[in-house]
């Protein structure tokens, strides 16, 4: 190879990342206009297109590098020099951490995910941890109640870049003050102040004002979801001030925020204080840097592995017919492999399953579908694998595994947040906890359906319970769009004997779903059946599902709230707008 080619390759990769992140910011910057114009379908399209940008630009760089090297092979020393040159470009680079992930992605694409070693990749960052640089402009602005909280909040809302009129700004300010007074106490409020992020966080049909509320007892989140009425007027829907509420808003089962972040590392550090339970990976995920979040997730896994002597075991719960799932007993994530062969009733291919997982990645997850990270050639030390799991891997997925002696390489897997399987949770709880779980399950089904997602297999085992008690769907092999399903009523029996027959007396075509049948497996437990009939009986009616389909086909996009309906100002203090009810 000619001298100096290593530097040219390093510069080409970094320039490719610059182009990718520039487009990322460009798509993100359109969020305000999409919100103001209520162009909700454009919101959904922008979300999908932004996700695809990263892989698209990796592909462009790979093609450039193949032209530069003229297809000639590169030896190990050459690759090390490329990484050394790239590392030297990063100390003064503002998005160094994601640039390292982009380098990794280009390398993996070029070399088909082989020879993934720390010498060739940025397995860990080359830069000091949480590197602080001089920030060209502050990320947030401070507001103090020198002239009272009403004046403070009026300044905050008036400073927003939104160009729509307010429905009733004074009313919203009264509601915010009422909430803060109830939460903090009237005496504490004058001693508090607020720091507000300069950029709004857009998602679905809301623009979120994200801030920090400094009190005598510490710092709390200060979150205001701003919505628009059908008439184009702004209103604040609620005020959230607990870390648990903020954690749900920034949760792993929600779509990524659109927030303009030219310095993502600085924004992540700023958010960390109000989201103490979130890992670095989760914070990057929340602001839409999902590929770097994957890097951080892998680093968190390696750090856990280095400090633990646990062995990988099969994950608790009913064994899946499509996926083999394993975990580390104390780790908060699970590893999912597509089996080589599925149970006979699962008439699908591995390619179909991967397409379903990609659909979830790109779709609005409405807080009810867990996000995943996809890995290839994932290496495990055999000494850390329980013998029972090793036997299961060899039995269920031998074609996905390469034996390297002391290690195995898993050709493809997903990593996903670990939850308590809902069927296990329901066995362990009684009373109000049981009622809450059934209410949450039904709400999850409704919200998925409203977002044009039909889970397919609605058994409790395919859902999990998060640490906040939310029910989240995580088994995607039968997922499809609501508009692809034919919801039917079961025809009346022709004769009494029909209902006793082993085969149905009516024809069933692919895509047919009979909601009346849900009752058989959802209400079999006598503790659960009455609760389900009380709260969610309409899920057993085909006309309920067909009505949702009609709304979807007419182009209606449902409102999605990251908090309970009872927390909305319209419920707590009075009517606000004519927008749809919270689900």
From Swiss-Prot:
Report whether Cytoplasm shows up as a keyword of the record. Answer: yes
The enzyme's E.C. designation: 2.7.11.5, 3.1.3.-
Q: Which GO terms describe its biological process?
A: glucose metabolic process; glyoxylate cycle; tricarboxylic acid cycle
- The residues responsible for catalysis, as annotated, are 371
InterPro entries according to UniProt: AceK_kinase (IPR046855), AceK_regulatory (IPR046854), Isocitrate_DH_AceK (IPR010452)
- Classify the source by domain of life: Bacteria
- Annotated residues that bind ATP are located at 315-321, 336
Where is it localised? Cytoplasm
Is Nucleotide-binding found in the keyword set? yes
Pfam family of this protein, just one?
AceK_kinase
One Gene Ontology molecular-function label: protein serine/threonine kinase activity
Q: What keyword terms does UniProt attach to this protein? A: ATP-binding, Cytoplasm, Glyoxylate bypass, Hydrolase, Kinase, Nucleotide-binding, Protein phosphatase, Serine/threonine-protein kinase, Transferase, Tricarboxylic acid cycle
Q: Which reaction does it catalyse?
A: L-seryl-[isocitrate dehydrogenase] + ATP = O-phospho-L-seryl-[isocitrate dehydrogenase] + ADP + H(+)
Sorted alphabetically, the Gene Ontology cellular component annotations on this record are: cytoplasm
Instruction: Give the UniProt family note.
Output: Belongs to the AceK family.
Function of the molecule? Bifunctional enzyme which can phosphorylate or dephosphorylate isocitrate dehydrogenase (IDH) on a specific serine residue. This is a regulatory mechanism which enables bacteria to bypass the Krebs cycle via the glyoxylate shunt in response to the source of carbon. When bacteria are grown on glucose, IDH is fully active and unphosphorylated, but when grown on acetate or ethanol, the activity of IDH declines drastically concomitant with its phosphorylation.
For this entry, the protein name equals Isocitrate dehydrogenase kinase/phosphatase
């Amino acid at each position: 190879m000619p001298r100096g080619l290593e530097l040219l390759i390093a510069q080409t990769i970094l320039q490719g990342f610059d182009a990718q992140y520039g487009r990322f910011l460009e798509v993100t910057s359109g969020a305000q206009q999409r919100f103001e114009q209520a162009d909700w379908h454009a919101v959904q399209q922008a979300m999908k297109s932004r996700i695809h940008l990263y892989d698209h630009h990796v592909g462009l760089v790979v093609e450039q590098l193949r032209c530069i090297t003229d297809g000639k092979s590169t030896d190990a020393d050459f690759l090390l020099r490329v990484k050394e040159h790239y590392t030297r470009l990063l100390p003064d680079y503002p998005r160094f951490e994601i640039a390292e992930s982009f380098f990794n992605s280009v390398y993996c694409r070029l070399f088909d995910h082989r020879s993934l070693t720390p010498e060739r990749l940025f397995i860990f960052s080359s830069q000091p941890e949480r590197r602080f640089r001089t920030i060209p402009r502050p990320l947030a602005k401070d507001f103090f109640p020198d002239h009272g909280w009403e004046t403070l909040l009026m300044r905050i809302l008036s400073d927003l870049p939104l160009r729509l009129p307010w429905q009733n700004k004074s009313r919203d300010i009264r509601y915010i003050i009422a909430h803060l007074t109830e939460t903090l106490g009237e005496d504490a409020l004058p001693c508090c102040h607020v720091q507000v992020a300069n950029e709004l966080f857009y998602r679905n049909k809301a623009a979120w004002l994200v801030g920090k509320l400094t009190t005598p007892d510490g710092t709390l989140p200060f979150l205001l979801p701003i919505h628009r009425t059908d008439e184009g007027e702004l209103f604040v829907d609620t005020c959230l001030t607990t870390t648990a509420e903020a954690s749900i808003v920034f949760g792993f089962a929600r779509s990524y925020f659109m927030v303009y972040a030219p310095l993502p590392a600085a924004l992540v550090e700023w958010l960390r204080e109000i989201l103490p339970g979130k890992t670095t990976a989760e914070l990057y995920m929340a602001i839409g840097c999902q590929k770097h979040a994957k890097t951080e997730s892998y680093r968190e896994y390696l750090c856990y592995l280095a400090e633990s002597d646990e062995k990988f075991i099969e994950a608790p719960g009913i064994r899946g017919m499509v996926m083999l799932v394993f975990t580390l007993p104390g780790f908060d994530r699970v590893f999912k492999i597509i089996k080589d062969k599925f149970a006979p009733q699962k008439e699908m291919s591995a390619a179909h399953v991967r397409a379903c997982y990609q659909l979830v990645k790109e779709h609005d997850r409405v807080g009810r579908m867990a996000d995943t990270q996809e890995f290839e050639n994932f290496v495990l030390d055999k000494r850390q694998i329980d013998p029972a799991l090793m036997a299961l891997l060899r039995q269920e997925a031998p074609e996905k595994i390469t034996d390297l002696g002391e290690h195995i390489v898993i050709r493809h897997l997903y990593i996903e947040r670990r939850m308590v399987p809902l069927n296990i949770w329901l066995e362990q709880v009684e009373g109000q906890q049981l009622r809450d779980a059934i209410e949450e399950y039904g709400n999850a089904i409704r919200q998925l359906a409203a977002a044009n997602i039909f889970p397919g297999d609605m058994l409790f085992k395919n859902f999990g319970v998060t640490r906040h008690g939310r029910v989240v769907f995580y088994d995607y092999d039968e997922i499809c769009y609501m508009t692809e399903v034919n919801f039917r009523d079961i025809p009346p029996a022709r004769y009494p004997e029909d209902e006793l027959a082993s085969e149905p007396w009516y024809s069933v075509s692919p895509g047919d779903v009979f909601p009346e049948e849900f009752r058989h497996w959802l209400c079999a437990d006598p503790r659960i059946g009455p609760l389900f009939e009380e709260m969610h009986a309409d899920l057993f009616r085909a006309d309920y599902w067909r009505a949702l389909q009609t709304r979807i086909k007419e182009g209606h996009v449902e409102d999605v709230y990251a908090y309970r309906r009872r927390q909305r100002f319209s419920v707590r203090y009075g009517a606000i707008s004519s927008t749809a009810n919270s689900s």
